[in-house]
Amino acid sequence: MSEEADLIARSGGGDLDAYDRLVGLYQDRVYQVAYRITGNREDAWDAAQETFLNAFRSLPRFRGASAFSTWVYRIATNAALDLIRRRPPQPPVSLEDVAVSAGDDPAETATRSELQQRLHHAITSLPADQRVVVVLRDVQGLSYEEITAVLRIPPGTVRSRLSRGRESLRRQLADLAPAAGV
């Protein structure tokens, strides 16, 4: 039995230490999914916390029909989308702050920061159905099959939403292509 499978089994039986270790394995990835969907850190932390609370409550019913990661990404996606639905639209917040070291060229740092802000704004401006698919595929690296399982939508729908989302990003970021080397 793998370490993850052991942690899942023990967590399902109420072992809080095992669940804490399981959360440690997934917390960064769950936060990233939530952040890319919600567009800000506070909502992402709220969604991540909600994800792990819901997962803990539901873990005794997890039967392994899909990978644990697929299951937890589904919970995270739902939690993030629920936050978006409940809260009024908020202005986007910049991506992770760019660390500036003494050797960094200030012009490069400013350009990199601007590129990150534009990309973040472009992603958060996508309709939620397209944003989720773009985040899961292009940011988190999930396969089409995994996205189909997470979102419970047909593969053709995944492909069309991804295509529309990418096209929208291309249009929004077209002026950056020469500067970014794309």
Where are these regions (language model features)?
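Short, Lys/Arg-enriched C-terminal cap helix and immediately downstream tail that follows
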Residues: 63, 85-88, 131, 166-182
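Arg/Lys-rich amphipathic alpha helix in sigma70-family domain 2
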Residues: 57-64, 74-94, 112, 175
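Helix-turn-helix DNA-binding module
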Residues: 42-45, 120-132, 136-157, 171
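Structural recognition of an alpha-helix C-terminal capping motif at a helix-to-coil junction
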Residues: 32, 46-53, 66-78
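Sigma70-family region 2
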Residues: 12-13, 36-39, 50-67, 86-89
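Internal acidic/polar
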Residues: 1-5, 89-115, 143
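Amphipathic, Lys/Arg- and hydrophobic-enriched alpha-helical face
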Residues: 23-41, 58, 123, 168, ...
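Short, charged helix-capping/linker segments at alpha-helix termini
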Residues: 12-21, 32-50, 182
